[in-house]
Amino acid sequence: MMRLIRTLPLRCFKTRIRRQGSLLCLRCFSSYSKPLLQKSMSLKNIQLSDLSSSPLSKNKEKQEKPEKENEGKHSIGLLDRFSEDFITQGNGLKPTTSQNQLDTIKFYQMLRERGNFSDEQCKIIIALLLQLLNDQFYSCYNDLFLRDMELNKQSHLFSSLETELKFAIQNSRDTQLNEHHLQLLKLKRELNSIHDELNEIIIDLLQKDAKLEFNNQKLENTLLYRQLNLKLNDCSNKIQTKILGDIRSHIENLRWQTTRSGLLVILVLVCSIMIGVSASKKERPGLQEPEEPEILAPKEDIDTTFPQDQHDID
């Protein structure tokens, strides 16, 4: 059906313009359709990948181009991926045709005034132009440009949403970091308080242990002091007894020596007295009788005094 629709206007056009000359008709047709055909040909030369790629993925595609050329694979466009519902249901422009974009009355008047065409010929030429534009330009325009614009809008929306998401994620991260930081500060404070409490408990225990050790050491010192006092008392008693014993022995020795010396002195005196008495008797023989009792008296005194001195020495 599409082939019949495309060929019917050409056949009708050939049959109806034979009388007025084909060259003039072709010149007018080429003058009006040449710029439009150039636009349509330029659209065909554009690759689908360049139109379908979003601005965010252009750098990646530039890097992947040499690899694709080496492999001999062509880039896949969006026509194979998305359907026409992407355009019709999107927020972008709607697909259009040449009937909606061209001013057919203006072209009709130009053909009537400058080309000297009849009414039917003008209608056929305009229908042919509209069909060619739809086939060569607006089909590609609807398939490529509108989708590209929609993709650009979607990419822009995606980028804006991405920035919003990044901002929200960053804010959430910042809030979470702040919360974690506050929790860490709280934990540090609690840890410091627990550490202080533990230090206080340890200090109390150490003080108690120190007091117990001090008391035990004090008791041990008192016991040692008592033992030392007892030992000192024993030693002092022993020393006193030894000293007293030595002193007594010395005193007794001195007594015996004094008694001996006293006895010797008394004996010497007695002997000297006896010698003196005997000598006096020899000198005075006549005086011996009255003097004998006088001489005997001191002997008795000496005998009586000797035991008194001995008692004093004892």
Swiss-Prot record:
Compartment(s) where it occurs, according to its Swiss-Prot or TrEMBL record: Mitochondrion membrane
Interval spanned by the transit peptide: 1-29
Biased composition range(s): Basic and acidic residues: 58-74
Cystine residue pairs: none
Top-level taxon: Eukaryota
InterPro entries recorded: CCDC90-like (IPR024461)
Membrane topology note: Single-pass membrane protein
Pfam family, one: CCDC90-like
Keyword set includes DNA repair: no
Entry keyword annotation includes Transit peptide: yes
Coiled-coil intervals: 177-207
Keywords recorded for this protein, A-Z: Coiled coil, Membrane, Mitochondrion, Transit peptide, Transmembrane, Transmembrane helix
Regions that span the bilayer: 262-279
Name by which UniProt lists this protein: Uncharacterized protein YLR283W, mitochondrial
